């Protein structure tokens, strides 16, 4: 360590901002200039992605993914109404007919392929030999051609005697009748329930529509599903039926039956018909007015009676003073006025 020069082994570390280059970078072909860094220097290579963007520009990220470039843009193309094609109704009768035909075809194929031992009858218990036509033909084949009388005699010999009623009853009890022995009874094989269910599942699987994909679900909004079904069935898109009443929320502090004033309030227009239309009278007011009218009528009647008596008395006094038995027309007019009569009495 002592052999080495201590000046060469030193490491110099300097803190500070990067120095500006002596020569500015030339302008690019696109006409953009290199923008200075916020701290005074030029932007580094790691910040080349943000070059060309203003420092005060705000960006909002709305979509993240592969299709982010086209999702936020408005294509401007008019969207066609969505339509779901109508599927044909299921024909139960034809399905049942086809299922029946398939079952009958399978049974017929099973009958055509006979098992090996089907022609041989099962034997058990006491077995009796049956005289068949083959033994008769073999015996007669060696003799050659026989006469007609001999053949008739052989047929008569081979013919069985007629059975009596007792013998037929005995055979019926013992269940040994020949028609039952010769009869071949066949019981069709019953298909298992599992085979039927499997065939039905295969048929439904073949007739089922294609499975919807995720793209189909994304293209069909939930609120448009019912309208799309109706369009597939022939709906023209026009609403039918009675129009529903649009319920609107009332403004604040507006009661039932009140109407919103669209213009300014006209205070003078509130009582335009107030002079001609008065409020109905109350019972107390009506009774008070009726009493006043009655009082006026009674008072007027009493005054008129008094005035009439006064006029008669004044007329009698005047006639006595004048010496006349009947007043003239002018005097009658004067008698009608009480004040004039009083003045005459004073005179």
UniProtKB/Swiss-Prot annotation:
Residues 50-59, 88-98, 128-137, 152-166, 194-209, 282-310 have a biased composition (Basic and acidic residues). It holds the Pfam family G-patch_2. It is found in: Nucleus. Its main location: nucleus. The keyword Nucleus applies. Residues 1-219, 231-310 are annotated as: Disordered. One of its GO terms (cellular component) is spliceosomal complex. Keywords: mRNA processing, mRNA splicing, Nucleus, Spliceosome. GO terms for biological process: mRNA splicing, via spliceosome. Associated with the spliceosome. Involved in spliceosome maturation and the first step of pre-mRNA splicing. PANTHER family: G PATCH AND KOW-CONTAINING (PTHR15818), G-PATCH DOMAIN AND KOW MOTIFS-CONTAINING PROTEIN (PTHR15818:SF2). Belongs to the SPP2 family. This is Pre-mRNA-splicing factor SPP2. The gene is SPP2.
């Amino acid at each position: 360590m002592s052999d080495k020069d201590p000046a060469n082994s030193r490491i110099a570390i300097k803190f500070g901002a990067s120095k500006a280059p002596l020569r500015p970078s030339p302008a690019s072909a696109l006409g953009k200039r290199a923008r200075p860094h916020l701290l005074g220097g030029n932007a580094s290579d790691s910040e080349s992605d943000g070059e060309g963007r203003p420092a005060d520009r705000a960006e909002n990220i709305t979509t993240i993914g592969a299709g982010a470039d086209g999702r936020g843009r408005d294509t401007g193309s008019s969207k066609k109404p969505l339509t779901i094609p109508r599927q044909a109704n299921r024909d139960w009768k034809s399905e049942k007919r086809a299922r029946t035909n398939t079952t009958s075809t399978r049974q017929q194929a099973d009958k055509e392929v006979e098992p090996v031992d089907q022609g041989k009858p099962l034997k058990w218990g006491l077995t009796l030999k049956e005289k068949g036509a083959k033994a008769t033909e073999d015996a007669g084949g060696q003799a050659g051609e026989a006469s007609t009388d001999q053949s008739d005699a052989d047929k008569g010999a081979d013919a069985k005697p007629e059975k009596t009623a007792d013998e037929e009853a005995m055979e019926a009890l013992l269940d040994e009748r020949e028609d039952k022995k010769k009869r071949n009874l066949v019981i069709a094989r019953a298909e298992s329930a599992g085979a039927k269910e499997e065939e039905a599942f295969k048929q439904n699987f073949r007739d089922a529509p294609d499975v919807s994909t995720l793209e189909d679900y994304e293209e069909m909004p939930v609120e448009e599903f019912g309208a799309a079904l109706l369009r597939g069935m022939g709906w023209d898109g026009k609403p039918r039926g009675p129009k529903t009443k649009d319920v609107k929320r009332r403004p604040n502090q507006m009661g039932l039956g009140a109407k919103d004033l669209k213009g300014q309030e006209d205070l003078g227009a509130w009582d335009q018909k107030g002079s001609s239309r008065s409020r109905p009278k109350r019972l107390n007011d009506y009774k008070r007015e009726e009493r006043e009218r009655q009082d006026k009528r009674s008072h007027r009647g009493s005054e008129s009676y008094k005035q009439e008596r006064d006029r008669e008395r004044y007329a009698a006094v005047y006639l006595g003073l004048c010496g006349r038995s009947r007043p003239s027309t002018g005097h009658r007019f004067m008698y009608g006025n009480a004040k004039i009569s009083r003045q005459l009495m004073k005179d």
